[in-house]
Amino acid sequence: MKKVLEVKNLEISFDTFAGKVQAIRDVSFDLYKGETLAIVGESGSGKSVTTRSIMGLLASNANVDNGQILFNGTDILKKSEKELQKIRGKEIAMIFQDPMTSLDPTMPIGKQVAESLMKHNKISKKEGLRQALELLNLVGIP
């Protein structure tokens, strides 16, 4: 299987008024195509910091003190915000733990998926809706 994500020795800290706070220490894991990965742990254990670092969504007071995040062989940590925007939602995505911030409950899920597809693939609304339906069927959502 092809390795799509490799997190190596990741260490992240935050600058605070009280000084530097270490959020995660020496986090490493691999994710292969077709696998599903769940990151679990106690509140405050660094799950969100780890996943936000993969998406390039760390707060401005965050410091990556060590490590690499390789997505398809390219280090995410070395990409500019503009480069990250091109891959977020198209090549890599994150489901946030608070579902109310992930999907709009007043809008059909197919339409929300279609909007993302249209934005990243520059396709028509009709094609976006068709592809969204296909993707939802693949994951068992009728």
Where are these regions (language model features)?
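ABC transporter nucleotide-binding domains
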Residues: 1-142
